[in-house]
Amino acid sequence: MDSHTVSSFQDILMRMSKMQLGSSSGDLNGMITQFESLKLYRDSLGEAVMRMGDLHSLQHRNGKWREQLGQKFEEIRWLIEEVRHKLKTTENSFEQITFMQALQLLFEVEQEIRTFSFQLI
């Protein structure tokens, strides 16, 4: 896993946790939770790829890992749409920068997960 991506996740999560978006704070908390879940999933896939022959362990631990992979891509798409919506509706420059960085990070993580999953297939 790229150390830049780790710091990006931490930075974006920290920035998002400081935002006050009024009535949509529940939505923001949901986004933060999804980001954290996505980071953990991406990390576990990356670790599985790093260990040779770990595909069997991954399949044994989670027989439906391909289904789970599909669900994670759905979560990424949902997060991308949510971040795009927040980006369009906010006028605060701090929030705009944060959401632009979050969007970029989501695209990077989606690509990393695709790469990891192709290596495991």
Curated annotation (Swiss-Prot):
Primary localization class, coarse: virion
Entry annotated with the keyword Transport: yes
UniProt entry tagged with the keyword Metal-binding: no
Disulfide bridge positions per record: none
GO biological process: exit of virus from host cell nucleus through nuclear pore
Subcellular location(s) per record: Virion; Host nucleus
Motif, Nuclear export signal: chain positions: 12-21, 85-94
GO cellular component, one term: host cell nucleus
Keyword list, A-Z: Host nucleus, Host-virus interaction, Transport, Virion
Leader sequence residues: none
Function: Mediates the nuclear export of encapsidated genomic RNAs (ribonucleoproteins, RNPs). Acts as an adapter between viral RNPs complexes and the nuclear export machinery of the cell. Possesses no intrinsic RNA-binding activity, but includes a C-terminal M1-binding domain. This domain is believed to allow recognition of RNPs bound to the protein M1.
Self-association state and partner proteins as the record states: Interacts with protein M1. May interact with host nucleoporin RAB/HRB and exportin XPO1/CRM1.
Family as reported in the entry's similarity comment: Belongs to the influenza viruses NEP family.
HAMAP family, A to Z: INFV_NEP
More info: Average number present in a viral particle is estimated to be 130-200 molecules.
Protein name per UniProt: Nuclear export protein
Species, as recorded: Influenza A virus (strain A/China:Nanchang/11/1996 H1N1)
